[in-house]
Amino acid sequence: MKPHKHAMASARKYGGKWQDYEEIHEFFDHSKSAHPDVRHRALLHSAWGIYLAERVFGRTFENSDGRIMAVRDVAEDHVFQDMGFIPTASKWLDAMDMRPWMGGPIKKRVYVAKGGPEHVD
């Protein structure tokens, strides 16, 4: 679902205008600019992404009806609408294959013995 449609759903559910919610919903879908298929969701569509949304937007905000809203509620709705549940970051990461580059650069150690240097990987 596009951020605008998420925002309209939030306005129907919580009151106010769709513009009150659009920035939160756009936050979750910004990862599409880095990876334009559904795998972009691995970056923010999780309990971790919901936590990050609270860090970015604060725990609450006031909508245009004057109602104090929890960012977490809006963020959870976004993830649930797209995923059907709220996955953990571990659920996403467990679905990925480990690659050697993920561990960072591999340093070769050199041991000097009586016979000269020996390279060990």
Residue ranges and their predicted role:
Residues 1-121:
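N-terminal membrane-targeting hydrophobic helices
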